[in-house]
């Protein structure tokens, strides 16, 4: 039993007892762990700022027999741009949920810089594109990265061609089946050449260059669907945050349409009869 310091990203927080919170943390030093923040729900608690979800904090923890306790919490970065934007916040929460679901306790320290970078990118770049980059690189770090270059059947390189049949992609198998072997896998879905090219690029590029990419919404939806299906096969289910992101997207799309309809209705009502 001892005190130790840790850099932590707060993945999740839930009420515990009358005034405490149980935190799920991703630490640079020890990976993912759970800790209790006692009295943090009281308005006067000094732990409040450093234990909020989606916060990068410097913590002092007491290592007990069964549960670790946060004794000090100082925020390093609160990511105001994420908390102030519902779309960015939804994507940041989804990243945290993915790390929580896919990494076991007391492991995943190598995911700390990936998630921290992801939250920084979300503060600047479009959420859907950052989410795709993060999901692919998370799969890669966890050893689940799909095979994007070679045919899983024969091992031959899969070329990207603007014309001709598309290669097949299997989330269950974890990658591509080229045209040379596709006849043996008629049940597989197909992947667009542009989507395959984007996935390869996202895996290799410098994340700081994300703003230079010009990706249409249709292609981005295709890539997102490929990654989500791959994650479902590894996590045995959906992420709850995905439905939140879809709901937020629908509401933002519908709002301008409703305003336009309301404006037209107002104009119609003002016309002389």
Curated annotation (Swiss-Prot):
**Record-level GO BP terms:** DNA recombination; double-strand break repair
Could you tell me which InterPro entries the record lists for this protein?
ARFGAP/RecO (IPR037278), DNA_rep/recomb_RecO_N (IPR022572), NA-bd_OB-fold (IPR012340), RecO (IPR003717), RecO_C (IPR042242)
> Which stretches does UniProt call biased (Basic and acidic residues)?
252-273
Which domain of life, per UniProt? Answer: Bacteria
- Entry-linked Pfam families: RecO_C, RecO_N
A GO cellular component annotation in the UniProt record: bacterial nucleoid
Query: What is the annotated signal peptide range for this record?
Result: none
Keywords of this entry? DNA damage, DNA recombination, DNA repair
Matching entries from PANTHER family are given as: DNA REPAIR PROTEIN RECO
Q: Name the protein family.
A: Belongs to the RecO family.
What is this protein's function per UniProt? Answer: Involved in DNA repair and RecF pathway recombination.
Q: What is this protein called?
A: DNA repair protein RecO
State the organism's lineage: Bacteria, Bacillati, Bacillota, Clostridia, Eubacteriales
